[in-house]
């Protein structure tokens, strides 16, 4: 019997290797999910090690109860942008040896129709990573201006037919409320004039709406800064992204933190002074899944791992 994709953590070994685990160290899994990365980290920690996990999804918090008997482990129900508050309360801020961030929507979220993330499974049009907070996708689409819908789909979904799709959504909601994933997928399918044979026409639009509903890019920007502040000197940051918008943010952040002091060309200043302002250094190049992993887990196909170390 083969393992289903929903149980597979993407770039598991590579991301853990990037953390350079110290058996007695303190680690943070900023996106617990179903605990694949957490369990791998725990397997390398001594009884003196410690792992703090975060997740904003109540179902992930429920799944973490399976680790409740492990004294090295604790989980907190919050966004990863709030990690500094959690670590400060534990007196661990600035003392963390490694942080792992696995961005985007998780496989269990995609696989549960009632969560409303997937156009492949009919369910209520929700898309919230924390279904107890904020407005659902259905609620937003019911009242959003056509130009705002178009902008979200174009900017966050990188969908070139954003205006046509937004127009189709507004016309459709005048006939009946858009409350299910299947309804929205059909509206998008009808609006897209040219189909990509390798991708469902609703893929980009669903991504864009989901990113907007969950403020995902703002969360990443804040989370990356919080991670840098939370690490100790020599601590590692291991980040897995799943589409170009996420990876662009991670790549830019690491590059900016690795630059050092920016001074006008020709200004007489020592290289040591420039280097002293560097906050991080990149560890190796971006890592993508092996062909073997892709054969086992198609959802890994767009993933990218980047690792950096705090100086």
From Swiss-Prot:
Its EC number is 2.1.1.199. It is found in: Cytoplasm. It comes from Pseudoalteromonas atlantica (strain T6c / ATCC BAA-1087). It catalyses: cytidine(1402) in 16S rRNA + S-adenosyl-L-methionine = N(4)-methylcytidine(1402) in 16S rRNA + S-adenosyl-L-homocysteine + H(+). The keyword Cytoplasm applies. This is Ribosomal RNA small subunit methyltransferase H. The gene is rsmH. One of its GO terms (biological process) is rRNA base methylation. S-adenosyl-L-methionine binds at residues 35-37, 55, 80, 102, 109. Keywords: Cytoplasm, Methyltransferase, rRNA processing, S-adenosyl-L-methionine, Transferase. GO terms for cellular component: cytoplasm.
């Amino acid at each position: 019997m083969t393992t289903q994709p929903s149980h597979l953590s993407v770039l598991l070994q590579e991301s853990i290797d990037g953390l350079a685990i110290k058996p007695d160290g303190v680690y943070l899994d900023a996106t617990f999910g179903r605990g694949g990365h957490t369990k791998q980290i725990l397997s390398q920690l001594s009884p003196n090690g410690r792992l703090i996990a975060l997740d904003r999804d109540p179902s992930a918090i429920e799944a973490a109860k399976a680790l409740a008997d492990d004294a090295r482990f604790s989980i907190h129900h919050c966004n990863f942008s709030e990690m500094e508050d959690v670590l400060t309360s534990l007196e661990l801020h600035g003392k963390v040896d490694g942080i792992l961030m696995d961005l985007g929507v998780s496989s269990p979220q995609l696989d549960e129709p009632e969560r409303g993330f997937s156009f492949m499974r009919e369910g209520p049009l929700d898309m919230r990573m924390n279904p107890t907070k904020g407005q659902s996708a259905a609620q937003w689409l019911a009242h959003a201006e056509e130009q705002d819908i178009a902008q979200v789909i174009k900017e966050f979904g990188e969908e070139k037919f954003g205006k046509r799709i937004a127009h189709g959504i507004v016309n459709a909601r005048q006939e009946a409320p858009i409350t299910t994933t299947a309804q929205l997928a059909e509206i998008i399918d009808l609006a897209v004039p040219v189909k990509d044979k390798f991708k469902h026409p609703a893929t980009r639009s669903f991504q864009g709406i989901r990113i907007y509903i969950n403020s995902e890019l703002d969360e990443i920007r804040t989370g990356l800064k919080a991670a840098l502040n939370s690490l100790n000197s020599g601590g590692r940051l291991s980040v897995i992204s799943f589409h170009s918008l996420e990876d662009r943010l991670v790549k830019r952040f690491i590059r900016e933190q690795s630059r050092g002091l920016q001074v006008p060309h020709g200004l007489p200043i020592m290289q040591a002074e420039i280097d002293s302002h560097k906050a991080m250094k990149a560890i190796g190049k971006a890592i993508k899944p092996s062909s073997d992993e892709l054969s086992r887990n198609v959802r890994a196909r767009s993933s990218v791992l980047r690792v950096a170390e705090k100086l």
